[in-house]
């Protein structure tokens, strides 16, 4: 085989044996025994093969449905703690995909959707749990922010845009999208502004809940192809949302007060009051674990919306020890990610134990949970990552407690075993 663009030997004009284009109309013409193929036909063949592989792969994936134990084990590899939430999620997700495989109706019994509501403070791992589950099942995953959603016809994001995001993740393959997972964050922010139904239109609160009802329960959503705007003459992609798993999450700040009020009704004041000391006070996570549908209604979610989210899991606040584990133990731990970046420069990165403790303490003081860890580590290593590509002979960088506290720069170790501070001390 060989490349032919100009046939200088014979002066004969060559043509692609497949599309008939001449050598002057294409970039490359590949020659075989009395046969020629152009680069455009090669690209077309590659596209056809890729499409066929894409059609076969979902069928292969459906053959293997991980058990709840296997799903939990996969979550353990990437998410620290939250044992109860992992168990609840593993069972709900397993049941959902079992329902898809075997049909929604079994022996005349209609199987309901097991959509999930996650309650937990900021940075406790709600998004990561949903993302990790989608990755372990090899299904499309899309995330939406409930605060940007409004009812159709108002300024803001239409709820059907959520399905559009899911389609984008799988190249507008409807069949694949219908097996996907959608995570809607900040769901507590669309709560009704008061307990009583309002006479005015609440387009970003109760209105969004009403708009999400059908989508979460199951409807055929009409989505413009390739993300275009809707217009009457357009053909829409029809997506059956009854097969999509919806996971909604939120911090639900203040919900614990609603639960406490219900739990202690009639015993809060007077001579008959139950006196509790500081040691008897339950944590917010312990209180949230006692949540009932009535509490969520009082918080501002409408009963119909709560009914569409039958599985409720509560995540606990992360303490300092958990944050230290998150920094170093998961498969994609932050310290491992930054070590991999430094390895690309042939530099070893070491975080000492006191540095990990100091980073965790800083995140605790900021009250951002695990979400704030990356920004702390990034700021610590910024100058070092800026200098190292231009600095010769560095083989190791060491981060200790003093670096995290801003008292010194990371220690750089050079090939000649001379140790210097990253501040450029020569």
From Swiss-Prot:
Q: Which UniProt keywords apply?
A: ATP-binding, Chaperone, Metal-binding, Nucleotide-binding, Zinc
Sorted alphabetically, the Gene Ontology cellular component annotations on this record are: HslUV protease complex
This protein's source sits in the domain of life called Bacteria
A Pfam family hit: ClpB_D2-small
GO molecular-function terms, A-Z: ATP binding; ATP hydrolysis activity; ATP-dependent protein folding chaperone; protein dimerization activity; unfolded protein binding; zinc ion binding
Q: Which PROSITE patterns match?
A: CLPX_ZB
Swiss-Prot/TrEMBL GO biological process terms: cell division; proteolysis involved in protein catabolic process
Q: Check the record and name the SUPFAM superfamilies matching this protein.
A: Glucocorticoid receptor-like (DNA-binding domain), P-loop containing nucleoside triphosphate hydrolases
Residues involved in Zn(2+) binding? 16, 19, 38, 41
**HAMAP family of this UniProt entry?**
ClpX
Function in brief: ATP-dependent specificity component of the Clp protease. It directs the protease to specific substrates. Can perform chaperone functions in the absence of ClpP.
Which family does the record claim for this protein? Belongs to the ClpX chaperone family.
Its quaternary structure?
A: Component of the ClpX-ClpP complex. Forms a hexameric ring that, in the presence of ATP, binds to fourteen ClpP subunits assembled into a disk-like structure with a central cavity, resembling the structure of eukaryotic proteasomes.
Q: What is this protein called?
A: ATP-dependent Clp protease ATP-binding subunit ClpX
* Organism (species): Shewanella frigidimarina (strain NCIMB 400)
């Amino acid at each position: 085989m060989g490349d032919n663009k100009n046939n200088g030997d014979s002066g004969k004009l060559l043509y692609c044996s497949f599309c008939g284009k001449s050598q002057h109309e294409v970039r490359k013409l590949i020659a075989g025994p009395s046969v020629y193929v152009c680069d455009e036909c090669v690209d077309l063949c590659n596209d056809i093969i890729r499409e066929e592989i894409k059609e076969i792969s979902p069928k292969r994936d459906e053959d293997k449905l991980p058990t709840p134990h296997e799903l939990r084990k996969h979550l353990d590899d990437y998410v620290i703690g939250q044992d109860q939430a992992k168990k609840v999620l593993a069972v709900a997700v397993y049941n959902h995909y079992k329902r898809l495989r075997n049909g929604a109706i079994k022996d005349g019994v209609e199987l309901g959707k097991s959509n999930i509501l996650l309650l937990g403070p900021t940075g406790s791992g709600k998004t990561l749990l949903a993302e990790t589950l989608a990755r372990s099942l090899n299904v499309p995953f899309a995330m939406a922010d409930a605060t940007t959603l409004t009812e159709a016809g108002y300024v803001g994001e239409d709820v059907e845009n959520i399905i559009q995001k899911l389609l984008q993740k799988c190249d507008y393959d409807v069949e694949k999208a219908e097996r996907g997972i959608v995570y809607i964050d900040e769901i507590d922010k669309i709560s009704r502004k008061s307990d009583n139904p309002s006479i005015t239109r609440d387009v970003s609160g109760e209105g969004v809940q009403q708009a999400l009802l059908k989508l979460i329960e199951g409807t055929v959503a009409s989505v413009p192809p390739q993300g275009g705007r809707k217009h009457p003459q357009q053909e829409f992609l029809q997506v059956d949302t009854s097969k999509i798993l919806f996971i909604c999450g939120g911090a639900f700040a203040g919900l614990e007060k609603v639960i406490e009020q219900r739990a202690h009704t009639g015993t809060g004041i007077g001579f008959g009051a139950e006196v509790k000391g500081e040691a008897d006070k339950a944590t917010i996570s312990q209180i949230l674990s006692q949540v009932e549908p009535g509490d969520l209604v009082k918080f501002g979610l409408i009963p119909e919306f709560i009914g569409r989210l039958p599985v409720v899991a509560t995540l606990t606040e992360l303490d300092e020890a958990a944050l230290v584990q998150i920094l170093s133990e998961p498969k994609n731990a932050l310290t491992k990610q930054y070590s991999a970046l430094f390895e690309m420069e042939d530099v070893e990165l070491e975080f000492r134990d006191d540095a990990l403790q100091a980073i965790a303490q800083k995140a605790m003081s900021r009250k951002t949970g695990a979400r704030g860890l990356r920004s702390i580590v990034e700021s610590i290593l910024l100058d070092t990552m800026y200098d190292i590509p231009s600095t010769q002979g560095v083989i190791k960088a060491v981060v200790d407690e003093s670096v995290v506290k801003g008292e010194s720069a990371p220690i750089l170790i050079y090939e000649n075993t001379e140790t210097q501070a990253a501040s450029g001390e020569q």
